[in-house]
C-alpha cells in the first residue's frame, strides 16, 4: 500500500499584548468602529520587546508536539514559514529546532508571505510520504515590527502569532492531502511589499526607515486578486480531491480580511457556518493565520475522524494556493 500522511497534532501561540481597535483608531484619527466594519477585526496581538520570532514559533511547535504525543527524535523535518525571521541570515528554523530539542531534524525557512503555510504543508507532506518520517510545520510572524504606523492599510490589519502542525506517515489514502492547487502572479509583485532590506534596495546610512516597513499600494486590487486566486485554487484542489464544496466540513481560509474569505466562501458555495473565523480576535498574522485557526478550531471542537478540511490563502507576490486535507 502506498504511504500517505496524516495530521497528528496542532499548536498555536500569540504574544501577551492585546491591542484593541480604539488604540489604533485614535492614533489614525478614524471614527469608532471603522476597522471592524471594513476588516472584521476587533483586536489583535502584538509582540512585546521580549518576544522573538523564534520564541513564538517554539511555543507553537512545543504545543503541537505535545498534542501529537510523539517522541521528538521521530521528527525528520521542520519547516518554518515566515516573513519576519529573527535575522536576514541565518535562517531561524535551525534555532527553533534546537530550542525544541529536535536533534535529528533538518530545518529551513520558507518565505511565502500569506500563502507560506500552504506551501510548507505541501512540502512536509511530500517529505513524510517519501521518507516515512514525521514533519513539524510552523508558521509565525511578528508583523507589528514591520507596520508603517502612518499607513492605514497596514496599521489596521497586521498582527503577530504562530501556529503549528505535526504531520506523520500513515497508510490510509483518505487522510492527509487529498488535493492541492497553487498559483502565482508576479505582475502584481509590488502590491504588498517591504521595499528595502533585500539586495535590490540594501541597507545604507541614508536609508529612509519608511522603506523598511510594510506598504500596500492598492487595497482594492489586493482584495479582488485575493478573492480570485483563493477561489480558483480552491476549485482546482477540490476537483483534484474529488470532493464537492458542500462536502467540506470546515473551510479554514487565510484570515486576511473577513470580506475576502466571506466572498470566497460564497463563490465556492460553502455554508457560512463551515468557515472557521479567527480574525475578529487575532487579526492578520500572514502565514500563521491558517495553522493558528486550525489549532483554535480543534481546541473548541476537536476534529472528528473523516472530516474533510479546505485550506486556502493568497497574498504578497502574488502567491496563493489551496489544499484539501482528510483529518
From Swiss-Prot:
It catalyses: malonyl-[ACP] + an acyl-CoA + H(+) = a 3-oxoacyl-[ACP] + CO2 + CoA; glutaryl-CoA + malonyl-[ACP] + H(+) = 3-oxo-6-carboxyhexanoyl-[ACP] + CO2 + CoA. The keyword Protease does not apply. It comes from the Bacteria. Disruption phenotype: Inactivation of the gene leads to biotin auxotrophy. GO terms for biological process: biotin biosynthetic process; fatty acid biosynthetic process; secondary metabolite biosynthetic process. The active site is at 114, 254, 284. Pathway: Cofactor biosynthesis; biotin biosynthesis. One of its GO terms (molecular function) is 3-oxoacyl-[acyl-carrier-protein] synthase activity. Residues 255-259 are annotated as: ACP-binding. It is an enzyme of class 2 (transferase). Keywords: Acyltransferase, Biotin biosynthesis, Transferase. Its EC number is 2.3.1.-. Involved in the formation of the biotin precursor pimeloyl-ACP. Catalyzes the condensation of glutaryl-CoA, an intermediate in lysine degradation, with malonyl-ACP to produce 3-oxopimeloyl-ACP. Belongs to the thiolase-like superfamily. BioZ family. PANTHER family: 3-OXOACYL-[ACYL-CARRIER-PROTEIN] SYNTHASE 3, BETA-KETOACYL-[ACYL-CARRIER-PROTEIN] SYNTHASE III. This is 3-oxopimeloyl-[acyl-carrier-protein] synthase. It comes from Rhizobium loti. The lineage of its organism: Bacteria, Pseudomonadati, Pseudomonadota, Alphaproteobacteria, Hyphomicrobiales.
